[in-house]
Amino acid sequence: CGTTGECSTMTDEEQLAAIKYTVDLVNHRVPVIAGAGSNDTDHGCALAAKSAACGADALLLVTPYYNKTSQAGLVAHFTAMAEAGGIPVILYNVPSRTGLNIAPETAKELSKHPLINGIKEASGNISQVAKVAALCGDALNIYSGNDDQVVPLLALGGKGVISVVSNVAPELVHNCCQAFFDGDTAKACALQLEMLPLEEALFCEVNPIPVKYAMNVLGWNAGECRLPLVEPSDAHKAKIEQALQAAGLIKE
């Protein structure tokens, strides 16, 4: 569970139950990456260990939020959580939400740990991502955390995207990445641009409000958001529905 899965309003018990349910459901067909981030290192270590015990294949660890820390603190925090979990780790850099950025030099230091081998980059700063790629090379797999920057990050050696749009249009996001990997950059760029109206609709309010509404419209029982998140406005509901229809996701 991450941002889109509303992990911030789930209890540990709910989060672990969701991980276990997913592990059992996919039955090794695809890896299960469990969100286990925390701004309390001791709590994060416990959650990392329990997530691994539930059968997760890897952990997605966001930077500490609110209390934050120094770059040296980030190294200590993530190192402790990686060792507590004992399974591969993807770092999650989303300073717009946490108020804390993983500097490229810090990413390089963390990439030396044998279990820390990926980063979800949602800083929106392409120059920073380029520096991470240059400093870390193959030691750190880069994944876009922004749906509107998939192709730019792939062009810098990125391995894919951890996506919001894919919750409603998985084939579109997959095809964009696959086209790039197949060497058809023109098609990849075209599909990246094709995603823009959906991206604008799915971020017309804070994520995951719009995407959960969209999933419910499409017949997926995503339920309601928990407070403090509320339903989208009527105007935004209409915008989301129009974008889904334009993308061919709502069948007449």
Where are the regions a protein language model picked out?
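Short secondary-structure boundary segments
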Residues: G2, T63-P64, S123, N146-D147, ...
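Active-site beta->alpha loop and helix N-cap motifs at the rims of alpha/beta catalytic domains
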Residues: C1-G99
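Ligand/cofactor pocket segment of small-molecule handling proteins
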Residues: A56-A58, Y65-K159
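Structured C-terminal cap/extension of enzyme domains
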Residues: D148-E252
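Short functional linear motifs
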Residues: Q15-L16, A107, K237
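Surface-exposed amphipathic alpha-helices with a cationic face
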Residues: K20-N27, A49-A52, A82-E83, S111, ...
